[in-house]
Amino acid sequence: MNTLKLTNQQYAEKINFTALINCYMREFTNWSRYLGIPKYDIAIAQNIRKTPTNLHIRIDFSSIGCDVYIPVAYFSETGRHLFDLPVLRRILETDEVSEVDIYGFMTLIAEYSRGIHSDIDASTVLKRLNNSIENLTTYLDHLVENNKLVNDLEMSFIEAEQSLVLGHILHPVPKSKQGFNQEDLLKYSPETSGQFQLFYFLINPENVIEKNADGKFVTKELGEKIYPLLNSEHKKLWNEFTDYQIVPMHPWEAEYLLVQEDVQIMQEQGILFALGHYGEFFTPTSSVRTVYSENSKWMYKFSLHVKITNSERINLYPELHRGHDISQLLKTDWGKNLQKDYPEIDFMVDPAFIAVKFNDKVINGFNISIRRNPFQGEDKTKNVTLLAALCQDGIFGQPSRLQNIIVNTARNLDLSVEQVTLDWFKQYLHICVRPIVGILNKYGLACEFHQQNVMIELDKKGFPAKIYFRDNQGFFFREGRKELVSNVLPGIADESQSIIDEGSLAPKYTYYLVTNNILGVVNALGCNQLADERKLIDLVYKSFKELENEDETGLVDYIINKRSWYTKGNLITSLQNINEADENLEYPAFFLDTPNPLNKYFFSNKLIKPETKEIVYSRYFEEDNVNISIRPFNIENDFEMIHEWFNREHAKPFWKMDGPKRDLELWFRTILPSDEQHSFIGYVNDVPQFSFEPYWPMRDVVGAYYDALPTDYGTHFFVAETQKDKKFSFQSFQVALDYIFMLPEVGKCIGEASVDAVPTDRIITKLGYTREGVIEMPHKTAYLTFCTREGYWEKCPESRLEAKSI
């Protein structure tokens, strides 16, 4: 039932728009949160007053003459947000504000990107965007027409596989399939539960490469199964070429292959014969190219020359060997011990493969990876679900499947939804984090544990019971355990190219396991209002922190301590029209650094996101007979005062924040909701006289200029008073440091005052700051200084006593 007042086409556009905006926010930095309705920007005030939210995303497109405002329905700690419409664009020269649709927004992105990246292909990405929207509309129509539910409490393997209607939530063209026409789309898409027979070729055995770690060649099995079904002409042909092998193929790919020059030559030379469609009907899993039948012992993962999202889905020859290698390994004592040590993880392996060569060259279109099918007979109804589908948003305003499962479990157990959510997530971390880190360390096995490769088996209560990993492409071995696995299976990586160097392991593994997988679950729970994401992030941090001393690979250190993580840029990859399956490219996708969400474990709400506007700390200095107090900045009451302060002559050279009220208001409305910094007003004997701005180097630009820790905090300090006997600068700065150091999450306080700010340098030296070096920042040359609690208290022992009294 559709509870939204949107057509399927409009809903498809909104889903794609949400994905596109989220991709932009992940891959570009010219955006900020924007809080409230401005007083000095009339054009924006008049328009955002009409939107349903007080928080917007502002994108600074000033280099192309505009800015954009997007209403935020839910802002996520993990980086995938929910938005309302409309999106507004303001022409800066005229202040004209108008709505911008998804195509207009993509055009702006492409225009802006040309100033940063090379080879931007706007026309192609716009076509793919339109294709994605049209395809999603088709899938939504099918959902409605067939009254198909995708949020049932229990779903079979194939039902769950075919429930991922909305697609990749962090891809700008999530349902793009270039190569399928409308008939193909309905017939071969998992979203429409398409059914089709496979196409079969008869091929000279000298041109077939085949392996099966489980025993008999699959072509032999298929021959015995398909031969009785052949028509008389094809039986006669096979009887003539009795040693030829039967090779299955996805019917769409078969049509593609039959018009390729090499294949046509093979036909002319009698090396290959096209038999056509035979046998049982298969249906696609979520990947489109892997097909399933409940009556088949195998699932077939075909090459498919259809560009799905960013790549033509081609099996490369070395990848075929990875499935075969891991299947062999799991049969050894190495594999038996691994499965005994970590029963929480099960591997759906591809023990067999078929490839076809011609003139000593493998034809990639024929590459088939063949997977064991554990979902046959009674097991076909197992409550096993693709993680990406489980994390999918609700459709048409209905609850998501994850929400239904947790709410139902809470009802059955008579517990709060939040408690069940936390318990559910703890159980997921239990079967995920320690086993995966342990397998990597002890056995050297690394897997691309992203949401599309992971399935979760749920127990009768709805809690995670087991993880299934699939995809032969995603098996690797770290360099540090190469000797171990090579001793077990000599020559294991010769064909599969599956050894990964230790240096690149942590960044890539973090992207698959944490960014995509674990934090994807956090995001789904948060977006469904089931739990506070901060609580879930804390659980993730603790789960990895517990393993810090057990991990020798550097993975855990990277996950919990790095300021930024290595992340895939699907939008930039799409804008540059890169085919990720291009084997000629060393790095076929674009990767970039993004902030580490686990740093939020050390985030100080009291410094950066205070909830009060009242006095938070006061101190009386008896010797000077002065009382100094501080409170968080209130933009409605303090703005005009601080604007006047920043326009005083002594402030201009160092602060450089003088200018129109509209510009300063924009700055405040973007920093106040940010994770970077906040502003406090200081009083001397009840007279507002100074400001200080605590900031967090994990999000502030300064953190990129030194080896920042998540417990580091800094502050900017400004005294508005110029009369010497009224300034009390030293005492005021003490109050700021007293407050900062009373918070247990703070480790040390850093400074980066300009080398020209001599008075500031004198004060902070007296307060216990030590100079660590000089840093060259875009807007200044600065001294990097550190101040610890002990260093501060040593210089100002009365502050230690003050802290004890608090």
Identify the meaning behind each predicted range.
Residues 300, 626-628, 687-691:
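Glycine-rich phosphate/pyrophosphate-binding loop shared by adenosine-nucleotide-utilizing enzymes
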Residues 616-621, 633, 638-639, 686-806:
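Acyl-donor (CoA/ACP) binding surface of acyl/acetyltransferases
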Residues 650-667:
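Conserved GNAT-fold acetyl-CoA-binding loop/helix
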Residues 1-431, 459-606:
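Nucleotide/phosphate-binding site architecture used for ATP/NTP-dependent chemistry
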Residues 669-681, 690:
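A short helix-loop-beta-strand connector motif used in the catalytic cores of GNAT acetyltransferases and
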Residues 304-308, 453-460, 471-474, 634, ...:
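Short, flexible loop/turn elements at secondary-structure junctions
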Residues 424-460, 467-468, 682:
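Conserved catalytic-core segments centered on acid/base and nucleophilic motifs
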Residues 608-625, 633-655:
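A short, well-structured alpha-helix characteristic of acyl/acetyltransferase catalytic modules
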